[in-house]
Regions:
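Conserved, mostly hydrophobic/aromatic
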Residues: 76, 119, 167, 197, ...
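Bacterial signal peptide processing site
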Residues: 20-23
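Sec-dependent signal peptide recognition
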Residues: 2-9
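Glycan-recognition patch characteristic of GH18 chitinases/ENGases
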Residues: 32-157, 256-261
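Substrate-binding surface in catalytic domains of secreted glycosidases
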Residues: 57, 86-100, 172-312
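Surface-exposed amphipathic alpha-helices with a cationic face
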Residues: 46-51, 102-118, 122-125, 191-207, ...
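C-terminal motif of bacterial Sec signal peptides marking the signal peptidase cleavage site
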Residues: 15-18
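Glycan-binding loop/region signatures in secreted carbohydrate-active enzymes
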Residues: 41-43, 127-134, 279-350, 370, ...
Length: 383
């Protein structure tokens, strides 16, 4: 087990991976293309997915520029909305960025009515008129706050005709950059929040949360960060952030690798051990590579990996044990682990064998221009 210093870096890495566009490095003007995978015939596959509930979920950000292909996703989680709190009193929530961006995503339901769109809430602050980060902690200290938040969520879902709420509180009881938190009560209060959401939204809308990978039972017997067992009765599924689990020279999203601090298999097993059914678990796929948590570049989008200077880096090196590719320098040093169609296929097959619900990815715009990874996720889920 690595020390607390590494754990804090791991948490910081998850925050970068889950809530922001990773840094890019210098690029070759003519990137070497990936082989564009043939996509499984979408309509028949989608009909089958609808009947058995499989998930191919894309996180789509407010700062992205692309409009997703509505026929190679089953779910879109729109990132993000943020909470407004003043002196401990809930004031409401707002979308981050421009409303027009969100509305353009919602409009995709006109071409594919089966598409599910959920609004994802962040603990962070991006809007210039909002001053308090970490507002989940303050929100959850008042039953009235939580009730009014849930009512606002319901009104928003009805207004836009979308399908659910996704919560991305990273993480209860932990402070980032001075964000409000209360380690004594945040974990338990998070359960109360999803309970209130379920009571208000009923069974007509989906509720999910972004699951932390290294949560475990603390020495006191309680849970640190997220009480995954306590949350389970109130959520439809968990989007497990199986990425940013280590840094170079290890893989950050290995399928199974005892050399890494954590891997996908161990993260999923923690949820199964807590009593969460496999068919409520969605495996996370990063569309970026992780180099470091503290040194530049910290992370590199997939499209930038393809554009790395081929005279300085070798990509598509394969690690059989981790079932993931990596980039190495021409001197043979491990630069970053990442995912490609081969590793996504392996993860999809593993998830199906475990009886999991499907795959999700962060995030749509980090793929290459051909949509190589998006198509690979769709194919892996629809096999």
């Amino acid at each position: 087990m690595k020390n607390r210093f590494l754990l804090l870096f791991a948490l910081a890495g998850m925050l970068l991976g889950a809530c922001g566009d990773p840094l890019e490095v210098g690029t070759d003007p003519v990137p070497e293309p990936e082989i564009d995978p043939e996509i499984i015939e979408p309509f028949a596959a989608r009909n089958e997915a609808i009947h058995d509930g499989r998930h191919a979920t894309a996180y789509v950000t407010y700062y992205g520029s692309l409009i997703p292909d509505a026929y190679i996703v089953t779910h879109i989680n729109y990132a993000f909305a943020e909470l407004y709190m003043v002196d401990g009193v809930y004031q409401g929530f707002k979308l981050q960025g421009k409303t027009a961006r969100f509305e353009s995503i919602v409009a995709l339901k006109q071409s594919n009515p089966d598409l599910k769109i959920c609004l994802s809430f962040t603990h962070g602050v991006a809007n210039s008129d909002n001053k308090q980060g970490g507002s989940f902690s303050a929100l959850c200290k008042s039953e009235d706050n939580m009730r009014r938040f849930a009512e606002d969520c319901l009104a928003f879902l009805v207004k836009y005709g979308i399908d659910g709420i996704d919560l991305d509180w990273e993480f209860p009881g932990l402070s980032w950059s001075g964000a409000a938190c209360d380690p004594a009560v945040d974990v338990d209060n998070y359960v109360l929040l999803v309970k209130q959401l379920r009571e208000t939204l009923g069974d007509d809308y989906e509720i999910s949360y972004a699951g932390y990978c290294t949560d475990k039972v603390a020495v006191t017997g309680g849970y640190r960060y997220i009480d995954i067992k306590g949350m389970d009765p109130y959520v439809d599924y968990v989007n497990i952030m199986t990425y940013d689990l280590d840094e170079a020279p290890h893989h950050h999203s290995a399928l199974s690798d005892p050399r890494a601090y954590k891997d996908c298999a161990r993260a999923v097993q923690a949820y199964l051990d807590a009593g969460v059914a496999a068919n409520k678990l969605v495996l996370g796929i990063p569309f970026y590579g992780r180099h470091s948590w503290s040194q530049s570049p910290t992370a590199i989008t997939y499209k930038s990996i393809l554009a790395l200077d081929r005279y300085k880096y070798r990509r598509n090196q394969w690690d059989e044990q981790a079932q993931c590719p990596y980039v190495e320098t021409m001197g043979g040093a491990f630069f970053c682990g990442y995912d490609n169609p081969r590793s996504i296929a392996a993860k999809g097959a593993w998830a199906r064998q475990k009886g999991m619900l499907g795959l999700m990815y962060w995030e749509y715009d980090q793929d290459d221009a051909n949509g190589t990874l998006r198509k690979a996720v769709w194919n892996a889920v629809m096999q």
